[in-house]
């Protein structure tokens, strides 16, 4: 416990006073003031805080709580303060706790007693909830823009690779041939769902808590709908207790952010594998890689590796917010000061990761021949041979058994099924004829046969890309 031998109201170095002080008989201990302050991190809300205050003052003048002259003085003062902050001349003071009190104190310093009227009908509880929602709404819009750019990059790369054949994997073992374009469209679909989740989250973020005051509302004749219109909110909150106390909208964002990072991490894992000497499927340009301080030959895929690593911190940010909120009674508690850093970190990490991916993906260079050669290893057309037999009347389980024996021969002779002779294949079934090579065993036959919506045939991939462009137009309209 920090103690002091100074008189209760002295201006001792380890004490400070706040703007809420009337009820207190001694100043706040200096360490406690620093420990409980949030201005070190919530100052990034300054634009939203000032916008909210301007709207609040405008509304107070409309309902007659402020005069028009007082409103104009407040707006002019707040506009000047914003300019000071952006010029780097504003002095942020820890003894004033947070962004709200720092700005209000400076306003009062500039325009006098009128500045003290700004907080009429408002609490920091609804003020900060409004700031967070305004800030998060802006950040969601920025993140959606990055998602759109990444999605367009994926579609552009997919369009160049509708005929590029590569092995598809299950259990990281060769499964069936797919086109590289089809694989890229799988990533695209994941990001579409991420986009839809964020857009849906934004709808719930875009509800205005301002006017809820501390917890029960205010006695002043406020016009919340007018304030909401000024700030671009779709609606006002329905319950004052809920409006100031819950942060589920921030949790929802962090959950959506976690899913984005999970998808980016999976993409990163594949890129890391594909750029290795063991795969060599793709080349990442040098500008997205680094080298080794000791091994001259190294070209490390640092961007996807970092994004894979950063996914864990965003998951942690989600758990931090869930844990923060789970034990709180209504309404506002000081615990909620801890909501900002996990939210900020998730926002910053997702934004940076998407920016890196949006720049990197269009620049990827596939090694087409190496991909094709890899698809020829691992008996990727085995299922096609089984389907070939089924179409000739063999029950699927029997066909499965027949092809399994053919694969065993291929393993023994170190040959792909397409490299076995017709005579070798016919020893397992006399229904296998010369057309098997064109209809089942070539890579092109395999991918072309999957000619349905969602399939990997080049024709379907081209159609899927065309549909995807239209979906993007609708998604971001």
Swiss-Prot record:
CDD domains listed in its UniProt record: Argininosuccinate_lyase
UniProt-listed InterPro entries: Arg_succ_lyase_C, Argininosuccinate_lyase, Fumarase/histidase_N, Fumarate_lyase_CS, Fumarate_lyase_fam, Fumarate_lyase_N, L-Aspartase-like
Coarse class of the protein's main subcellular location: cytoplasm
Domain of life according to the entry: Bacteria
Any one GO BP annotation for this protein: L-arginine biosynthetic process
Name of the top EC class for this enzyme: lyase
Record keywords, A-Z: Amino-acid biosynthesis, Arginine biosynthesis, Cytoplasm, Lyase
Pfam families found in the cross-reference section: ASL_C2, Lyase_1
Family: Belongs to the lyase 1 family. Argininosuccinate lyase subfamily.
UniProt name for this protein: Argininosuccinate lyase
UniProt source species: Acinetobacter baumannii (strain ATCC 17978 / DSM 105126 / CIP 53.77 / LMG 1025 / NCDC KC755 / 5377)
């Amino acid at each position: 416990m920090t103690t002091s031998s100074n008189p209760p109201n002295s201006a001792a170095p380890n004490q400070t006073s706040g703007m809420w002080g009337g009820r207190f008989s001694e100043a706040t201990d200096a360490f406690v003031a620093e420990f409980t302050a949030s201005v070190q991190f919530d100052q990034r809300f300054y634009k939203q805080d000032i916008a909210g205050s301007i709207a609040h003052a405008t509304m107070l003048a409309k309902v007659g709580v402020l005069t028009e002259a007082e409103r104009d003085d407040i707006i002019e003062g707040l506009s000047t303060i914003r300019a000071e902050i952006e010029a780097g001349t504003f002095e942020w003071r820890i003894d004033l706790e947070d962004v709200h009190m720092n700005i209000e104190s400076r306003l009062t310093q500039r325009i006098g007693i009128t500045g003290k009227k700004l907080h009429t009908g408002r609490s920091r509880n609804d003020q900060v909830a409004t700031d967070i929602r305004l800030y998060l709404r802006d950040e969601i819009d920025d993140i959606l823009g990055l998602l759109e750019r990444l999605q367009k990059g994926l579609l552009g790369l997919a369009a160049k690779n509708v005929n590029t054949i590569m092995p598809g994997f299950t259990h990281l073992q060769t499964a069936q041939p797919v086109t590289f374009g089809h694989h890229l469209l799988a990533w695209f679909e994941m990001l579409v769902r991420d986009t839809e989740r964020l857009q849906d989250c934004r709808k719930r973020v875009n509800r205005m808590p301002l006017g809820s005051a501390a917890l029960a509302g205010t006695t002043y004749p406020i016009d919340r709908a007018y304030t909401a219109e000024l700030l671009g909110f779709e609606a006002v909150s329905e319950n004052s207790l809920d409006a100031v106390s819950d942060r589920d909208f921030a949790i929802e964002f962090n959950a959506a952010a976690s899913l984005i990072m999970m998808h980016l991490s999976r993409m990163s894992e594949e890129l890391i594998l594909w750029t290795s000497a063991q795969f060599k499927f793709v080349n990442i340009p040098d500008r997205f890689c680094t080298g080794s301080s000791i091994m001259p030959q190294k070209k490390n895929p640092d961007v996807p590796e970092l994004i894979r690593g950063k996914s864990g911190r965003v998951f942690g940010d989600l758990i931090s917010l869930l844990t923060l909120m789970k034990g709180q009674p209504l309404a506002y508690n000081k615990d909620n000061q801890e909501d900002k850093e996990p939210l900020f970190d998730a926002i910053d990490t997702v934004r940076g990761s998407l920016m890196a991916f949006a720049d990197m993906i269009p620049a990827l260079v596939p090694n087409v021949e190496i991909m094709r050669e890899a698809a020829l290893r691992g008996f990727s057309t085995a299922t096609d041979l089984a389907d070939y037999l089924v179409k000739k009347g063999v029950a699927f389980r029997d066909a499965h058994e027949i092809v399994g024996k053919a694969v065993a021969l291929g393993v023994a002779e170190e040959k792909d099924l397409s490299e076995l002779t017709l005579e070798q294949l016919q020893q397992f079934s006399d229904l296998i004829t010369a057309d098997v090579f064109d209809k089942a065993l070539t890579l092109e036959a395999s991918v072309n046969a999957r000619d349905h919506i969602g399939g990997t045939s080049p024709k379907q991939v081209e159609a899927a890309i065309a549909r995807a462009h239209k979906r993007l137009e609708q998604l971001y309209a």
